[in-house]
């Protein structure tokens, strides 16, 4: 129960934390999926939200999955998944669903050892940033629960009246795009005190960190 209460703090907020911040002496960036969590949160969210429609939706994604085998373009595959499972939903609906998902699954998704390191940096007064390839709308409730100062994630294309159009607004936030997005906020000479990741998509972010943590978290939720 304590884990659920801790995760629920701040989940009533309605917007991802994507505003500008001033540079601080201690700046720490964490990847989300596989680093702070034990598995991909976006796939888990889509499956949970789709319910019995999940299998049919995946079947309809077959052409995109086959294309990925050849081009290895994660952004194209993610855009196809957004079109299949989220297109037409309102941003408000997705935000509400993301909050419900975080409240239900944070205790079974978050790595306890990663959260402990996160809290350790926070106790030192570091500015804490999550930089993720998952959509910012989906990760925002987790980021708020963790007390993140900033969330940088993949943005979804939305209409002026607040509906998901399908596809991505800009590039998939992985690899060099993570550094590009960090520089947009903190300037071209940004340097991270520490960074943590678990895939090749985090290499560029780790390269601008003084302390690099690659696949160092192995903890499983109780």
Swiss-Prot record:
Which Pfam families does the entry mention? Answer: HAD
Q: Which CDD domains match?
A: HAD_PGPPase
The cross-references to InterPro entries, in alphabetical order and at most eight, read:
HAD-like_SerB, HAD-like_sf, HAD_hydro_SerB1, HAD_sf
Q: What is this protein called?
A: Protein CicA
Which species does this protein come from? Caulobacter vibrioides (strain NA1000 / CB15N)
The top of its lineage is: Bacteria, Pseudomonadati, Pseudomonadota, Alphaproteobacteria, Caulobacterales
């Amino acid at each position: 129960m304590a884990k659920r209460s801790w995760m629920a703090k701040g989940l009533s907020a309605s917007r991802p934390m994507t505003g500008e911040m001033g540079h601080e002496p201690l700046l720490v960036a964490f990847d989300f999926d596989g680093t702070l969590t034990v598995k991909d949160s976006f796939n888990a969210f889509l499956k949970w939200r789709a319910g019995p429609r999940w299998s049919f939706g995946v079947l309809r994604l077959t052409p995109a999955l086959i294309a990925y085998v050849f081009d290895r373009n994660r952004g194209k595959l993610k855009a196809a998944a957004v079109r299949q499972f989220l297109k037409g939903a309102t941003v408000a609906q997705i935000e509400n669903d993301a909050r419900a998902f975080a409240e239900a699954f944070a205790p079974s998704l978050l790595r306890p050892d990663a959260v402990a390191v996160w809290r350790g940096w926070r106790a030192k007064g570091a500015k804490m940033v999550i930089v993720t390839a998952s959509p910012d709308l989906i990760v925002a409730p987790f980021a708020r629960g963790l007390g993140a100062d900033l969330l940088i994630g993949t943005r979804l294309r939305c209409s002026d009246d607040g509906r998901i159009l399908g596809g991505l607004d800009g590039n998939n936030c992985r690899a060099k795009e993570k550094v590009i997005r960090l520089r947009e906020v903190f300037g071209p000479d940004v340097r991270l005190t520490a960074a943590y990741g678990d895939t090749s998509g985090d290499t560029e972010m780790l390269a601008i960190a003084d302390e690099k943590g690659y696949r160092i978290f192995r903890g499983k939720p109780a």
